[in-house]
Amino acid sequence: TLSILFIIILSFYEINKQKKNNLISEKYIEAGLYLASNDLEKSKILYEQIIFSKNPFYSTLALNTILEKDLEKDSSKILKYFEIIEKIINQKEQNDILNLKKALYLIKNSDEQTGYEILKELRDSNSSLKSIAEEILKD
């Protein structure tokens, strides 16, 4: 009976996790539709909600869209988004990509020194992005 209870709890957990993922994916699609119809404020709000949901896949996509479409002007908010996503990513390669984006964002917008420090860390680590970081540091 204990094993049956465990299986039921595990099944419930997986179903709940899948439902949450589906809701976030629907929200991501909705944000994209708002963006396509040029309703930037509604799309930004939905992308922020996705980031705060802490879904590793969709939060990263939402941040990428916010950065690419320049939906958020407040750099402190953008840095907060980076912090949230840094805490939920557990693969080194994804974390390196996020750090590269953060470095480029900082160099472009607010804090060149910190951006270059992040690039130096990527260069000095065993990152697959080492050559890209070196190339940017040369310029």
Describe the role of every protein-language-model region.
Residues T1-K17:
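Single-pass alpha-helical transmembrane signal-anchor segments
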Residues F12-I24, I89:
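TPR-adjacent "capping" and linker segments in tetratricopeptide-repeat scaffold/adaptor proteins
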Residues Y13, Q49, I84-I85:
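A short, mixed-charge helix-start or loop-turn motif at secondary-structure junctions
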Residues E14, E26-I29, L33-S37, T65-K69, ...:
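Residue-level signature for tetratricopeptide repeat
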Residues K19-E26, K42, L98:
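Alpha-helix N-cap/N′ positions at the starts of helices
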Residues E26-L61:
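Short extracytoplasmic
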Residues K54-S59, L63-N64, D70-D139:
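Soluble extracytoplasmic domains of inner/organellar membrane proteins
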